[in-house]
C-alpha cells in the first residue's frame, strides 16, 4: 500500500535542542527496557546450548579410602584366575582390610530422543525472544512517533491560538478607539476581554498536555524535548507479512517440540555409554603381608526402556492443552490484526480526504475572518458574531493538525504490525 505524505502548510515547529527523530530512535537502544529484551534473547540462546551440552560426555575423577572389619578382595576375579594366583609362588588373590581406589568415570548418552526435541524447543524459544525484542523496539518507536505527532499537533495548535490571540488583541485596540470616541458601548470591550481570557485558559491547558507527551518521550529515550521534532515519510511501508505474529508462531513451534519431548521421554528408549577405570591399592595384603595394587575397569552400553509412568502420561495431556491454547491464541491474534489492518487502511484513505477538505476550509475561514474584522470595526457586526469567525478559523486549523497527527499514528500502528523499522522510514 502506498501511503501519500501529507504536505504540511502550517508554521514549522523548531526543536530548540536540535534533536531529530532519528536521534530519538537511536536513544532507544541505550534504554534498560530494550537491554532487558536483549538479555532475554541471550538467555534463550544459552538455553539451547544447555540442552545440547547433554550430548557431551561427563568426565569425573574419584577416589576412596575404605577400611573393612574383615579382609575383602581388592577386585573381582573369576575362579580359574583366583586358583592360579593362589598356586603361584609370590602371588596371591589380593585381600586386605584397608583398600584405596583412584580412578576415572565417563558417562555419555548415545541415544536420547527427547534431547533432540528439547534442543529444537529451545531454538524456537530463542527465535521467539529475538522477534519479541524486535517487536518491542518497533512498538517503542511507534510510541515515540505517536507522542511526537501529538506534540506536533499541540505545538501547532499553540501557534494558532497565539495567532488568534494576537488577532483578537488587534481588534481590541480598534474597538477601544471606538469606545473612547463614544461610537461603541464599553461592554464591547468586556466581550473581547472575555475571549482573550478563554484563549489564555486554552493555551495553559495545551501546555499541560504538552508536558505529558514530553514526559512520555523522555521515559523511552531519556531525552527531554522542548518542542516536537520534524518528521517526513522517507520510504513507503513494506507489507511482507504480519510480523507481530512471529513471536507467537515460534512459541507455538516450541510447544509442539515440547509435546514431542514429553512423548519421547514416556515412550522412547535411552542408550548410554558408561566407562570406569580405577587403580585399587590394598594395604598389607593378607597373604603377602605387603601393599599391592591392581588396575580394574569396564565399559558398559546400557539401554533403558520406559514401560509405565502415569505422571508422564499426565504431562502429555497438559502439553497437548498448552499446544491447543497457543494455537487458539495465534488464531485470535491473527483475526484481530487483520481487522486492525483493514480498519487502519480505510481510515488512512478517509484521513487523506479530510486533510484536503480541512485545508480548503482554512482558506475559506481566513477570507471570512478578513471581512468580519472590517465589519466589526465599522460597527456592522456584533462582537459575538466576529468572535465566531475567529473560532471558526481556530477550529479549522485544529482539525487539520489533528488529521495530520492521526495519520502519523495510523502509520505507526501499521509499522508495528508489519515489522517495519521506523528508523529507516522516517527522517
Language-model region placement:
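Acidic, low-complexity, intrinsically disordered peripheral segments
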Residues: 67-69, 225, 399-427
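Periplasmic alpha-helical coiled-coil/stalk elements that build and connect Gram-negative outer-membrane
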Residues: 46, 133-246, 251-253, 344-347, ...
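Small/polar, glycine/serine/threonine/aspartate-rich low-complexity segments that form flexible
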Residues: 62-105, 275-312
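Start-of-domain marker
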Residues: 23-64
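Gram-negative bacterial Sec-dependent N-terminal signal peptides
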Residues: 1-17
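Amphipathic alpha-helical coiled-coil scaffold segments and their short linker/junction regions
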Residues: 22-31, 80-86, 123, 218-276, ...
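Sec/SRP-type N-terminal targeting helices
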Residues: 35-39, 52, 109-137, 187, ...
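A short glycine-centered flexible hinge/capping loop motif at secondary-structure junctions
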Residues: 179-183, 376-382
Amino acid at each position: 500500500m502506498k501511503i501519500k505524505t501529507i504536505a504540511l502548510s502550517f508554521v514549522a515547529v523548531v526543536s530548540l535542542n536540535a534533536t531529530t527523530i532519528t536521534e530519538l530512535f537511536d536513544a532507544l537502544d541505550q534504554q534498560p527496557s530494550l537491554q532487558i529484551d536483549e538479555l532475554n534473547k541471550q538467555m534463550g540462546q544459552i538455553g539451547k546450548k544447555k540442552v545440547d551440552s547433554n550430548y557431551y560426555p561427563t568426565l569425573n575423577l574419584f577416589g576412596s579410602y575404605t577400611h573393612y572389619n574383615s579382609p575383602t578382595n581388592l577386585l573381582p576375579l573369576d575362579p580359574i584366575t583366583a586358583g592360579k594366583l593362589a598356586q603361584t609362588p609370590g602371588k596371591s588373590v589380593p585381600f586386605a582390610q584397608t583398600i584405596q581406589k583412584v580412578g576415572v568415570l565417563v558417562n555419555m548418552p548415545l541415544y536420547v530422543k527427547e534431547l533432540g526435541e528439547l534442543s529444537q524447543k529451545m531454538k524456537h524459544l530463542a527465535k521467539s525472544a529475538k522477534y519479541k525484542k524486535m517487536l518491542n523496539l518497533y512498538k517503542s518507536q511507534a510510541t515515540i512517533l505517536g507522542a511526537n505527532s501529538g506534540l506536533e499537533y499541540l505545538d501547532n495548535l499553540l501557534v494558532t491560538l497565539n495567532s488568534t490571540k494576537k488577532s483578537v488583541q488587534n481588534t481590541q485596540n480598534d474597538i477601544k478607539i471606538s469606545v473612547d470616541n463614544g461610537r461603541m458601548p464599553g461592554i464591547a470591550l468586556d466581550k473581547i476581554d472575555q475571549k482573550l481570557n478563554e484563549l489564555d485558559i486554552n493555551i495553559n491547558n495545551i501546555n499541560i498536555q504538552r508536558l505529558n507527551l514530553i514526559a512520555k518521550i523522555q521515559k523511552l529515550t531519556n531525552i527531554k524535548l522542548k518542542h516536537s521534532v520534524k518528521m517526513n515519510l522517507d520510504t513507503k511501508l513494506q507489507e511482507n507479512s504480519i510480523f507481530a505474529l512471529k513471536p507467537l508462531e515460534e512459541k507455538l513451534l516450541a510447544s509442539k517440540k515440547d509435546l514431542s519431548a514429553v512423548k519421547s521421554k514416556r515412550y522412547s528408549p535411552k542408550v548410554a555409554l558408561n566407562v570406569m577405570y580405577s587403580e585399587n591399592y590394598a594395604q598389607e595384603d593378607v597373604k603377602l603381608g605387603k601393599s599391592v595394587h591392581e588396575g580394574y575397569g569396564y565399559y558398559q552400553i546400557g539401554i533403558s526402556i520406559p514401560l509405565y509412568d502415569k505422571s508422564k502420561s499426565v504431562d502429555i495431556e497438559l502439553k497437548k492443552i498448552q499446544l491447543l491454547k497457543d494455537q487458539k491464541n495465534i488464531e485470535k491474534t491473527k483475526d484481530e490484526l487483520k481487522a486492525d489492518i483493514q480498519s487502519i487502511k480505510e481510515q488512512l484513505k478517509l484521513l487523506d480526504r479530510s486533510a484536503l477538505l480541512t485545508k480548503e476550509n482554512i482558506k475559506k475561514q481566513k477570507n471570512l475572518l478578513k471581512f468580519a474584522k472590517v465589519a466589526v470595526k465599522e460597527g456592522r457586526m456584533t462582537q459575538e458574531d466576529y468572535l465566531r469567525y475567529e473560532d471558526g478559523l481556530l477550529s479549522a486549523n485544529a482539525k487539520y493538525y489533528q488529521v495530520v497527527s492521526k495519520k502519523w499514528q495510523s502509520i505507526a500502528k501499521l509499522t508495528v504490525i508489519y515489522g517495519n523499522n521506523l528508523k529507516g522510514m522516517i527522517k
